């Protein structure tokens, strides 16, 4: 994966940038979630509010191709040891540029440099399955290519 990402990084038309441009990011997030017939956990206003309420805890990495936003990763700092990739989204019109891979690679580099001990790659589920918590094998495999290990979160419920 490392050699592959290096080749992508050498593309002069691709640029990664840490910024706070939620207005550019949110339409990409909406389109990605719509593919799965779901909506984002947070509205655009909520993301901006969270960023104001918790300064430095939300970190947005945007990916641009020829100046156009084609992807972004929003990371939430959980504590001094853990950062969570909460949303890793791409514009499906640019699959050959592999923005998701670039974004994760840069997030790993950033998290390591910032001294985090753990990088949580987030959930890997199939929201359209009969059980929406069904693991997505292809998404898990994608994440494992970066050296991550999967863990199953078990949900328990009690009916009153």
PLM regions: where:
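A conserved beta-strand-loop-helix scaffold within acyl/acetyltransferase catalytic domains
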Residues: 1-95
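Short, contiguous acidic/charged loop-to-helix segments that flank catalytic cores in large enzymes
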Residues: 90-98, 128-133
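Short, high-confidence coil segments that cap the C-terminus of an alpha-helix
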Residues: 113-116
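Active-site/acyl-donor-binding loops of N-acyltransferases
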Residues: 118-160
């Amino acid at each position: 994966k490392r050699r592959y990402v290096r080749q992508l990084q050498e593309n002069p038309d691709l640029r990664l940038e840490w910024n706070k441009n939620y207005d550019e990011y949110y339409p990409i997030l909406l389109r990605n979630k719509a593919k799965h017939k779901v909506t984002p956990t947070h509205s655009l206003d909520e993301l901006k509010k969270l960023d104001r309420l918790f300064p430095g805890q939300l970190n947005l990495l945007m990916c641009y191709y020829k100046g156009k936003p084609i992807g972004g990763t929003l990371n939430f700092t959980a504590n001094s040891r853990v950062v969570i990739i909460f949303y890793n989204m791409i514009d499906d019109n640019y699959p050959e540029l592999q923005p998701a891979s670039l974004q994760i690679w840069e997030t790993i580099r950033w998290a390591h440099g910032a001294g985090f001990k753990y990088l949580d790659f987030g959930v890997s589920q199939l929201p359209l399955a009969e059980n929406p918590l069904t693991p997505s094998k292809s998404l898990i495999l994608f994440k494992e290519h970066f050296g991550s290990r999967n863990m199953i979160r078990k949900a328990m419920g009690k009916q009153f």
